[in-house]
Amino acid sequence: MSSAIPLNVGIARSAGTATVDADTAKRVLLAEPRGYCAGVDRAVETVEKALEKHGAPIYVRKEIVHNRHVVETLRERGVVFVDDTAEVPEGAVVVFSAHGVSPAVHEAAAARNLHTIDATCPLVTKVHQEAKRFARDDYDILLIGHEGHEEVEGTAGEAPEHVQLVDGPDAVDRVRVRDENKVIWLSQTTLSVDETMETVQRLRERFPSLQDPPSDDICYATQNRQVAVKAMAPECDLVIVVGSRNSSNSVRLVEVALNAGAKAAHLVDYAREVDPAWLEGVRTIGITSGASVPEILVRGVLDMLAEHGYADVQPVTTANETLVFALPRELRTTRR
C-alpha cells in the first residue's frame, strides 16, 4: 500500500546536493505523495477501457471522479455523464463512479436492462460491506461524512434503517441511538483525519461503548496526502492545492495546510487560476494535489511558478505508494 520513509522537508533537491537558504531564495516544496490514488487510477482506466471495448457513447452515473479536467477530457472522447440511471437509454453501457452507489441504484439499472460496469473504489466497497455487516447485527451505525456527497449516499443506502449521518463534531449532539451498547462509527473515505477523530472523540463522550470500524475507513491516500501537507505547511508562506471544488479530499488539504501552519492556502483546478497577487512577498510555496488530479495539472502550476522565479523545486516525501487495484472483471486484460 504505502510505506513511511525518512522525511525530507525539501531542503535539497536530492541526496547529496547543496542545501538552499530559504531566507535568500524562492523555492517550491512539492508534496510526495500527491495526485492519483489507486482507486481513481482504476476508475479512470475503467472508463477508458469501456470506451475501447464498447465504443462511444458510454454513460457514467455522476462524475467518474471529482476532477473537472478528467471529466471534460472524457466527455470529449464520447462519455456522457448523467445524474440518474433514468437518463441512460435502455440496454446501454453505464459505469458507476468511484464513489459507489446504493443497492437501489443497482436495482434501477437492472430494471432498465443496462449493462453496468462498477468502478467503485475497493476501499469504498469495504465501507459498504461494513455497513451491511453491522446492520445485520442490528447496530446503530454512525456514518461520519458530508451530507449530499455521493459516497455517503451510497454507503447509507446499504442500510438506511440503521445508518445515521454525522456531519462533523457539531452534529454529535443531535445523534440518537436505540441501544448505547450497540453503536459503531464508520466514515467517508476522504475526510480530514483530524476532524474525524475530533468527531469520534465527541461521539465517544456521549456513547462510551462506541465501537471502532474493523479497520481505518479513511483511505491510505487521503491520509498520506494530509501527512505530506502537514510536514511542509509550517515552512510555507503559501500552499497551492491542485484540485476541484467538489473534491472532498482536495478541499480537506486546504484546511489541513492552514491548520498546520501555512500562512495562506488556495485551491485551483488549473495554473491559470493562480492569482499573481498571492505570490507577493512569498518565498516558500507548497504544492500538492488531490487524489483525483492528473500530474499534468501540477506540472502546469510548477511551470507557471517557474516563470515567476520559483524554479527551485524541492520534494517533501513522507510515504511511497505502490498499491494497484484490479480493473472490473469484464475489462481485465493486461494493464497498461
From Swiss-Prot:
Annotated active site: 151
Binding site for dimethylallyl diphosphate: 66, 99, 149, 247-249, 292
Binding site for (2E)-4-hydroxy-3-methylbut-2-enyl diphosphate: 66, 99, 149, 189, 247-249, 292
Gene Ontology terms, MF aspect: 4 iron, 4 sulfur cluster binding; 4-hydroxy-3-methylbut-2-enyl diphosphate reductase activity; metal ion binding
E.C. no: 1.17.7.4
Top-level taxonomic group: Bacteria
Protein name (Swiss-Prot/TrEMBL): 4-hydroxy-3-methylbut-2-enyl diphosphate reductase
UniProt KW keywords: 4Fe-4S, Iron, Iron-sulfur, Isoprene biosynthesis, Metal-binding, Oxidoreductase
Example of a GO biological process term: dimethylallyl diphosphate biosynthetic process
Co-factor: note: Binds 1 [4Fe-4S] cluster per subunit.
Reactions catalysed: isopentenyl diphosphate + 2 oxidized [2Fe-2S]-[ferredoxin] + H2O = (2E)-4-hydroxy-3-methylbut-2-enyl diphosphate + 2 reduced [2Fe-2S]-[ferredoxin] + 2 H(+); dimethylallyl diphosphate + 2 oxidized [2Fe-2S]-[ferredoxin] + H2O = (2E)-4-hydroxy-3-methylbut-2-enyl diphosphate + 2 reduced [2Fe-2S]-[ferredoxin] + 2 H(+)
Cofactor(s), by name: [4Fe-4S] cluster
Residues annotated for [4Fe-4S] cluster binding in this entry: 37, 121, 219
Family, as annotated: Belongs to the IspH family.
Protein's pathway: Isoprenoid biosynthesis; dimethylallyl diphosphate biosynthesis; dimethylallyl diphosphate from (2E)-4-hydroxy-3-methylbutenyl diphosphate: step 1/1; Isoprenoid biosynthesis; isopentenyl diphosphate biosynthesis via DXP pathway; isopentenyl diphosphate from 1-deoxy-D-xylulose 5-phosphate: step 6/6
Function: Catalyzes the conversion of 1-hydroxy-2-methyl-2-(E)-butenyl 4-diphosphate (HMBPP) into a mixture of isopentenyl diphosphate (IPP) and dimethylallyl diphosphate (DMAPP). Acts in the terminal step of the DOXP/MEP pathway for isoprenoid precursor biosynthesis.
Binding of isopentenyl diphosphate, residues: 66, 99, 149, 247-249, 292
